[in-house]
Amino acid sequence: QILLLMGPVGAGKSALLEHIKRALELSAPVYHIEGCPIREEPLHLVPRSLRSTFEEHLGVKIEGDLCPICRYNLKSNFDNKYELMPVIRSGFSTRSRKGIGVVPPVDANTQDVSILIGSEDISKLDKYPEDDPRVLSLNGAFNVGNRGVVELVEVFKNEIEFLHTVITATQEKMVPAPGKHSMIYFDGVIIAHCNEAEWNRFKGTHTNEAILDRIVPVYVPYTLELDEEVKIYGKQLARSDFRAHVAPHTLELASMFSVMSRLKKTDKADPVTKMKIYNGEDVIEKGRAKKIDIKDLRDEAR
């Protein structure tokens, strides 16, 4: 399924995803078949007739098949002797496109499915037939994001037809190969993000049911606690090159302005009081016998 980070503009969806990718880049390298453009799982080399034996011995479930390029190399260069195929280790990298694929939003005139699944190298078509794996250039987001993560940036800004590859990737764990080639196994996490208005517009269209069924939305709200907003500003200031003196309570005042601009008006409390209540403070307004319940304020804002 697709993990969808959905929320208002500036809530931190992209920043959250950047932290996920950074954690992946700092994680341990993975083993994969040398020379494979999708960093193939080495256990895919095991023939299906022997997989049950390997699974019992290793205690793991072997899923998936070799990509067309590795299948060709195994047959042509190693005479189907899978134990001779070299295996190496490599880490994850966004810049080098290793295990992390990013799909930016594109307009309808420039949408090309090769961004997702790669393409055929036209320069090789005069030497090899169309169904020869050597003409494949598996550099799409679902290829480089195999065994890692694929990020769909502002996913619903794309045309719905552009997202059809996501259906097979989530339902069958397979993505189509460019040209006249077999489907390619995909083992990765798909994370998308979008704004609230785009999500509401997308789910309101009944023709999008196939993709909607595969989406798990996670709401990323604004920070409504004053103390947490101050921490965010303090962290950003500490990481910046800004070294000038900052007057006392500057961050608190800026945080108050930000938080109060996000709160909806209510007849139960004035904006400052509501901000204090959301911050966990016990506040009793003048003329009231008991304190205002934060649950009542949240229910009213929904």
Q: How does the language model describe each region?
A:
Residues 1-302:
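Conserved ASCE/P-loop NTPase catalytic core
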